[in-house]
Amino acid sequence: MSEPAILVLADGSVFHGTSIGAKGHTVGEVVFNTAMTGYQEILTDPSYFRQIVTLTYPHIGNTGTNLEDCEANHVYASGLIIRDLPLLHSNFRSSMSLRDYLQTHNVVAIADIDTRRLTRILRDKGAQAGCIMTGEIDEAKALELAKSFGSMAGKDLAQEVSTGEIFTWTSGQWQLGKGFIEQTQAEFNVVAYDFGVKHNILRMLAERGCKITVVPAKTSAEQVLALNPDGIFLSNGPGDPEPCDYAISAIQTLLASKKPIFGICLGHQLLGLAAGGKTKKMAFGHHGANHPVQDLNTQKVFITSQNHGFEVDEASLPSHVRVTHRSLFDNSVQGIELSDQSAFSFQGHPEASPGPNDVAYLFDKFINEMRKANLSQLSTYVAHH
């Protein structure tokens, strides 16, 4: 027998539906994602920490869940909202239904609500806090819980999802019949800051010949430089970048070292802050797998995967920071680079997962920057000996 559930937004909007996950209640910032597929990657993306995700595509769960399509070791989204959960799931890799997966991972979730109406509210009023409650339902209590969550602005969540200790990553991307391929040859030593890093980012770096040392969010620049990296990667992650003063300070020191630096998502925003710019909260952010972005260097347009609620404020950027990519949905900054050194970043997700791989070339750009830096060092050494 299905158990009733409700979703209550901080503005008082109430949606009645059916529980498809764990019992109890959950609170978080309610956002909408327009991707048609990839619900397992979305649920396990650390960038969704403290967020309740609404999937706008009506049928979610058709292919079940599996052991491979995870972006972290557990679910980070605070809750899930969908229109319809199919009675059957089918896929040759499937090991569990979405319902069982949500219950196993203790995720509170609701189905059978009008996600179209909900999305219009979030679009028109902006992302807002909400509460999903199952079983013994108390609308007044749910509204109180939603209002108590507050805003994402000012929340430093990166240190909450970051690894507690340094570890090495060598696994490449998944291949049919082979699984995840271990990379035994490494040309580059990369230190990756974990602000909530997605596994597919690490896989794509490993596949390009990188031995990756993943370090906690609060690792000092001195500790990173002591590892003698060829390049430094700044990962994606949840929350507001501005309170992450420990990361901004470390990045400023790392910029002075002139080592190649590449940032994605939160890492992009932190690079912008470290370079002297500012960030600001967006109304409802970008969450989806079909966002057109223009590369201003080539004028080419790419379809990208996006997941962020904050953006770099273009008007605040100093003269040595150049905008390289722009969203064709709202003209927001999607990429920057520093004119005086090898440091660049991208707001969307080149690693996709889920989504298109149109901008995977940015990983190749990072590889080329490290190769150039190493050749330059070698030339300098030879010239002086």
From Swiss-Prot:
GO terms for biological process: 'de novo' pyrimidine nucleobase biosynthetic process; 'de novo' UMP biosynthetic process; glutamine metabolic process; L-arginine biosynthetic process. The active site is at 265 (nucleophile), 349, 351. It catalyses: hydrogencarbonate + L-glutamine + 2 ATP + H2O = carbamoyl phosphate + L-glutamate + 2 ADP + phosphate + 2 H(+). Residues 189-376 form the Glutamine amidotransferase type-1 domain. It comes from the Bacteria. Its EC number is 6.3.5.5. One of its GO terms (molecular function) is carbamoyl-phosphate synthase (glutamine-hydrolyzing) activity. It is an enzyme of class 6 (ligase). L-glutamine binds at residues 47, 237, 239, 266, 269, 307, 309-310. Keywords: Amino-acid biosynthesis, Arginine biosynthesis, ATP-binding, Glutamine amidotransferase, Ligase, Nucleotide-binding, Pyrimidine biosynthesis. InterPro entries: Anth_synth/Amidotransfase (IPR050472), CarbamoylP_synth_ssu (IPR006274), CarbamoylP_synth_ssu_N (IPR002474), CarbP_synth_ssu_N_sf (IPR036480), Class_I_gatase-like (IPR029062), CPSase_GATase1 (IPR035686), GATASE (IPR017926). Residues 1-185 are annotated as: CPSase. The keyword Plastid does not apply. Pfam families: CPSase_sm_chain, GATase. Composed of two chains; the small (or glutamine) chain promotes the hydrolysis of glutamine to ammonia, which is used by the large (or ammonia) chain to synthesize carbamoyl phosphate. Tetramer of heterodimers (alpha,beta)4. Belongs to the CarA family. This is Carbamoyl phosphate synthase small chain. It comes from Pasteurella multocida (strain Pm70).
